[in-house]
Curated annotation (Swiss-Prot):
On the 2D-gel the determined pI of this unknown protein is: 5.6, its MW is: 36 kDa. This is Unknown protein from 2D-PAGE of needles.
């Protein structure tokens, strides 16, 4: 499951430009 860094974000899919 991949989220836009919201709630739960995959470490490999994490984007610094998006809120955590």
């Amino acid at each position: 499951i991949i989220y836009d860094x919201v709630g739960q974000c995959d470490k490999d899919f994490y984007r610094p430009e998006l809120p955590r």
